[in-house]
UniProtKB/Swiss-Prot annotation:
GO terms for cellular component: nucleolus; nucleus. One of its GO terms (biological process) is rRNA processing. Residues 617-627, 789-812 have a biased composition (Basic and acidic residues). Residues 22-43, 610-650, 768-813 are annotated as: Disordered. It comes from Schizosaccharomyces pombe (strain 972 / ATCC 24843) (Fission yeast). A motif (DEAD box) lies at residues 220-223. It is found in: Nucleus, Nucleolus. Residues 628-637 have a biased composition (Polar residues). This is ATP-dependent RNA helicase dbp10. InterPro entries: DBP10_C, DDX54/DBP10_DEAD-box_helicase, DEAD/DEAH_box_helicase_dom, DEAD_box_RNA_helicase, Helicase_ATP-bd, Helicase_C-like, P-loop_NTPase, RNA-helicase_DEAD-box_CS. Signal peptide: none annotated. PANTHER family: ATP-DEPENDENT RNA HELICASE RHLE-RELATED, RNA HELICASE. The Q motif is unique to and characteristic of the DEAD box family of RNA helicases and controls ATP binding and hydrolysis.
Amino acid sequence: MSGFQTSDEVDISNSLKAFPVDIATDNQKDKHENVGENVSDEDDGNYIASKLLESNRRTKGKKGNGKASNFQSMGLNQTLLRAIFKKGFKAPTPIQRKTIPLLLEGRDVVGMARTGSGKTAAFVIPMIEHLKSTLANSNTRALILSPNRELALQTVKVVKDFSKGTDLRSVAIVGGVSLEEQFSLLSGKPDIVVATPGRFLHLKVEMKLELSSIEYVVFDEADRLFEMGFAAQLTEILHALPTSRQTLLFSATLPRTLVDFAKAGLQDPVLVRLDVESKVSADLQSAFFSVKTAEREAALLCILQDIIKLPLKDNVRPREIGNVNNPKKRKRALELALKGSESGSPDSTLVFVPTKHHVEYVSELLVQAGYSVSKIYGSLDQEARLNEINNFRLGKTNLLVVTDVASRGIDIPLLANVINYDFPPQPKVFVHRVGRTARAGRTGWAYSLVRAEDAGYLLDLQLFLNRPLVTSSKQVKTDSDCDFTKQIVLGSLPQELVAELLEWVQRIVSRDVELQQLSNVAARGEKLYFRTRATCSAESAKRAKELVDSKGWSSNNPLFGDVSVIEAEEKYAELLSKVSSYRPSETVFEIGQRGHLKTEAAEIMRKRRNKVKPKGIKSEVASDKITDSSPGNMSEASESELEEVFKNPKELSKKKTTDFKDKEYYMSHYAPKESIQETGYAINSGENFTTAARHAILDLTNDEGIEQSRKGGQRWDPKKKKFVNIINDEDGSKGSPKIIRGESGVKLPATYRSGRFDEWKASKAFGANDSPIRENKRYKHNKLQTPKPADKFRDNYHKQNKRNREAKERGIGIKVNSELKSAVEIRKARELKEKRLAKNNRPSKKHR
């Protein structure tokens, strides 16, 4: 460890600490500085560890940057550094640079990072550094909870790679494995347990595990843990953990339920998130298309066919994965192919839809159109989910249809295009969607379909991004005059293209019964989705009416062609508008009723028409211009600005007038400068988790179309032949399966405590405090066995035969009859003895 220091290096370990050291730690240091004071062995160990950590630091660059630029500057031990470099890590990722120093200081951390950003190593490396080695007679000291078995097995593999060179033992506790095998694993007192919440809680209740020795807890993919319904299990596990633990929580997004859980389970947590993840890339180009609800499918096909020009299934060229026929090399070849697919294909496109029913419908429609499509939604099976993602990453498919919930944390390559089939109800959801493209200096496109009912959400997004809204083609001459990276360019799609594709969609849906059923189910699911969708602001709702009534809403988007084409489209649209809005000058009652043929009914209709006509003309005239689309600056003007604009004709008094506002207590009714932009982008420094999490909360609507918290009602019970409340199935009341109450008060199924562990323990030859795994961790085979019989058809027949003769000479492998009688033999001997006594009918000679 001393080899990391040189005479030219300066120890700046104190400046590396982003936050003040705990008062208890300072008191311990003061105690150690006093020579004459008695110190316990545990304090000595902590003091030595802190000194080694400080002496092991090596930093480059400026002091006090608050984060480490390489792994050597983090104060890690040499064994762990060798394991890190052997695994191929050269430099820490951004999430690792921000998280590892905080974890080494013992802080509780809430990290927001997507899958593939290095978050697993961000919490495994500090864990290995914290545990260092196995302690004598110690129980489990680290617990990692993952949402599914695949992620748990992947995490335990990473833990074993980083713990090479140490004697730390790690096990995976997941479903689908026999309980007896996991009884043995947990009875061996492993140092690190990587588990899924359901199976771990089952074993905790069954084995009556004591979790007081846990020092390090990680909730990996925490948003997916809550999404999959593990809230009750997590609450029960959290209640059993000691308060002195260090808790980590990693998530791709930050739902409100997760924030409440973090407040209850973490002590003064630090929110770590990457600023680049919360902003729209400067290289992102976006276009917005006004469509009707019935034309959305045709508009989607128009974007794919005429704008992106996505190749059809026959022209897709997947990435080669090597020798797939060899099963031993197939997995390795697949890993290499997936690793090399990070750049993505130039045509890779992500389509966001509101519900899982839309995923099924839209993906099937795109397949009918000839595209290669992958689909993912929240309740999709994990194996099918991985297959769909791998097909997309390998280039076998170039379209991925997903929901907001299903796309969280998915490790997908850099995308070229993102299409919002439904407009996101929140600006943060829009940023979450389009953040998949325009990464690593590459350009990307985001296309959004906006219906009349979505106009308010579009204006909310415009205020959030602080960009001007360009709607009418008269504002721009060609697409070169538009800046798609700095403006919100809104317009419709060419009507002839949409009409042709709409006719094709209607014909395909009418012919295919399955597609027609999927369309009906998606329409019903969207109605439920609208009930749970957030509403736009009141001001945006008012402006949305003006936007929809303007001519710019129906004019073509400047993305299509030059100005002549746009003008031709406008004339065509104007002609259609005139035809559709044509009103005859006379009603049916007035035709031929003039002069001497005039009737009383015709006169009544003429008077009525003259009275109603001015109102109709006024309502049909659309406004050609919209109110200022840029967000108004409602900040209070400064004194210098007022003096420049308004000149006083004369000084009222030589004495300067005093301001009525007290700078310390006055609260202005004006919004602060750039308040809208700051509300969207401002990220707290992290000193207060509640304040920082308030800006990072992202609640996504469930892709099932219904809200989880509102699940209720009744269901038909076939056994009781009547309707029963669904809530009874969850709390175990009124005839539902028997339950037990956990330590935290959570109701758990009674099957969690079935007595199988007691039966297993009784069948083993060790007690409750004994371990079936040897404590010295070194194993040596002492059993003497006979060599395998010689095979005369092998080349080593004579050599193997010689070994067999030598073994027999030493007495190895010779069967010796056991002198111990079995229970059956003992019983038979007793019966024979009783028969002899009865036959002789006289006592033995000893009793004469």
